[in-house]
Amino acid sequence: MANYFNTLSLRQQLDQLGRCRFMARDEFADGCQFLKGKKVVIVGCGAQGLNQGLNMRDSGLDVSYALRQAAIDEQRDSYKRASSNGFTVGTYQQLIPEADVVYNLTPDKQHASVVEAVMPLMKKGATLGYSHGFNIVEEGQQIRSDITVIMCAPKSPGSEVREEYKRGFGVPTLIAVHPENDPEGKGWDQAKALASATGGDRAGVLESSFVAEVKSDLMGEQTILCGMQQVAAVLAFEKMVDDGIDPGYAGALIQYGLEAITEALKIGGVTNMMDRLSNPAKVKAFELSEQLTDLLRPLFEKHQDDIISGEFSRTMMEDWANGDANLLKWREETGETAFENAPAYEGEISEQEFFDHGILLVAMIKCGVEVAFDVMVEAGILPESAYYESLHETPLISNTIARKRLYEMNVVISDTAEYGNYLFANAAIPILREKFMPTIDTTVIGKGLTAASNQVENKRLVEINEAIRSHGVESVGKTLRGYMTDMKAIVV
C-alpha cells in the first residue's frame, strides 16, 4: 500500500488539508435518526471503542462488538469490557455480515490487518467507519468500491468522550467522508449521525477530510497535547528538586497544576490563562514563552514537515515491524523519570497557588499552544482544525496526568500519539536542559515571585496583553468557544 496523501497532486493535497467547516447546530436537528434501526458493529473495545459505544447505545443505536476469536476464548480485557457492560459480543464471522456500519476502533497498528479481515465479510453497500484516518491516509488502505468510508473523530481521549456525554455535553468532533468511497452518497448523513450519537454535536462538529484530520491530529498530539506536557513535567520537577523543593510538593504542583492551568485555558483561552497570573508574573511568563518559542520552533516545524511528507509514519511503521522496540524502550524510560516516582504530597495546594508557583508551566503551555497552532496553519491546515488540535484538547490530556501522572496519559492516548510524544520529548528535553533550564529558578517554578520583583511597566504590560489577545489561536478560539456555551468546568 502507498501513502494516499503522497499520491495526490499538490492542488489536491492543499484542497484536502484545507477542508474545515464548522457545522451549524440545525444541521443536526435529526440527531442520529439516520442510523436508528441499523446494526452498528464496533471492532475493538479499548478506550475509544467502549466509550463511544456506551454513548451510542444511550443515544438509541443498536451497538454490538466484534472481537477476534482468541479475545473471546481467552476472555481478554476487550471481551470483559464489552460483556460486563451488557453488549452483545461475537466473532467477526458472527456479526460483521449483518452489520450496516462496521466501526473500526482498534489501535492504528492493527487497522490494516483488521480491515483486511473484515472487508470480505461486509455485505454489499455497508459502511466502514474510523475515528482516525491513519490507515486510509498514511497506509493507503484500499477499500472495496461498494463500501462507504466515513470518519467520526472525537477530539479527546475515550474516557473524556464518555464523561462529557454523561455531563450532558460532548467533545468537539471532526467528521469526514473518504472521497474515493461514497458510492451511494450517504456518507455525510451517516457521519453526522455518528457525531450526534457520541455527543459531538453538543460541543461542535467540523466538516473535515481524512487528510486534514490525520495531519493536524498527529501534529497536535506530538507537540502541545502530549510532548510539551511531558517535557514540562520532567524538566520542572528536576529543577525544583535540584533547588531544594520537597519532591512531594514538586510532583503535586505539576501533576495537578497542569490540570488547573489548562482548565483556565479551556474556559477562556490563552488570555484567561495568563490573566490568572499577577501582572509581574504575566510579564515573566510571556518572556519565558518567547524564549521557549525561539528554541523550540524549529523542532515543531520539523515534526510538522515529517508528518506532511509521511516520514513520521514511515519511521513509526518501521518500529511496528520491529516489535515496537523504540516505543517500549521510551515507555520504560518515562516510567523511570524522577517525576513519575515522586512521593505523594499530603498537603493542600490552592488553585491560585498552581498559577503563582507555576509560572514556568504557564509559559510552556502558552508556547506549545501558540507554536503548534501557527505551524499547522502555515502548513495549510485551517485555523479551526488547528485550534481543536492545539488549545482545546490540551486540558483533556492534562486531566489524565492529574490521575496517574505521565503513565496515565500514555496509557489513555493511542500508541501513535505515544510514539510521537516520545519522539518530541526526547528531542526537546536535551535542548532545554542545555539552553534554557540553567536560567530558571524557583521564582518561576516552585515558590513564586518575591515582593521585590512585584513591579511592572504599564507600557510593557499593554504590549504584552495586546500580543496575547491578538494571536490567531485567540481569534478563532473566541468564536469556537461561543458555540460551546454549555461547557462545564472540570475542576470543581
UniProtKB/Swiss-Prot annotation:
Its cofactor is Mg(2+). Keywords: Amino-acid biosynthesis, Branched-chain amino acid biosynthesis, Magnesium, Metal-binding, NADP, Oxidoreductase, Repeat. Substrate binds at residue 414. Signal peptide: none annotated. SUPFAM superfamilies: 6-phosphogluconate dehydrogenase C-terminal domain-like, NAD(P)-binding Rossmann-fold domains. Mg(2+) 2 binds at residues 217, 389, 393. Residues 209-344, 345-487 form the KARI C-terminal knotted domain. Mg(2+) 1 binds at residues 217, 221. The keyword NADP applies. Residues 14-208 form the KARI N-terminal Rossmann domain. It catalyses: (2R)-2,3-dihydroxy-3-methylbutanoate + NADP(+) = (2S)-2-acetolactate + NADPH + H(+); (2R,3R)-2,3-dihydroxy-3-methylpentanoate + NADP(+) = (S)-2-ethyl-2-hydroxy-3-oxobutanoate + NADPH + H(+). InterPro entries: 6-PGluconate_DH-like_C_sf, 6PGD_dom2, KARI, KARI_C, KARI_N, NAD(P)-bd_dom_sf. GO terms for molecular function: ketol-acid reductoisomerase activity; magnesium ion binding. NADP(+) binds at residues 45-48, 68, 76, 78, 108-110, 158. The active site is at 132. Its EC number is 1.1.1.86. The keyword Oxidoreductase applies. Gene3D superfamilies: N-(1-d-carboxylethyl)-l-norvaline Dehydrogenase, domain 2, NAD(P)-binding Rossmann-like Domain. Belongs to the ketol-acid reductoisomerase family. This is Ketol-acid reductoisomerase (NADP(+)). The gene is ilvC.
